Amino acid sequence: MEDIRKLFIVDEKEFDTKNTEKFIRKVADFVKIGKDGSIFLEIESMNKTDKIQLAITARFLANKLDKSILQEISLSEIMQSLSLPQNTATARISELIKGRSIKRIKAGQYVAVPHQIEKFVDKVNKKYGEKHG
């Protein structure tokens, strides 16, 4: 029974730490994180929803490498980093929250949902990898 339990019930911290390197390798061609946590997208052709999710995911992953970088990202950081107006950013963020790809941790603060990261980074590579490379 313990084998089944370990197979099915995961510790969220262990789950995401185990795959951090793999996920970072998959998104590193598309985004970089500054030492202060700032977001630098390396691809312009990405749609706004994917850009926002990539920024939130990258920030989350960066925190796993360097705890001085916050895992959450604010609405203002998203707007500034991605050059998006507030109404566009909030609309796309709402879609991502409804789709359970990200979660709001408090007003104007968002974080990636660990068990959604693999699906997202695979989608980004499939959708933008060849166009970008």
What is each of the regions a protein language model found here?
Residues 83-98:
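Short amphipathic alpha-helical interaction segments
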Residues 72, 108-114:
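Minor-groove-contacting beta-hairpin "wing" of winged helix-turn-helix DNA-binding domains
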Residues 97-107:
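A short, conserved structural fragment
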Residues 1-44:
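Long, low-complexity, charged/polar intrinsically disordered regions in eukaryotic proteins
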Residues 70-80:
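A short alpha-helical element within helix-turn-helix/winged-helix DNA-binding domains
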Residues 117-133:
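Short, amphipathic alpha-helical interaction segments positioned at domain boundaries
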Residues 49-71:
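Short helix->loop/beta-hairpin flanking segments within DNA-binding domains
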Residues 47-51, 73, 88-91:
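Short, well-structured alpha-helical interface segments that form or flank functional binding sites
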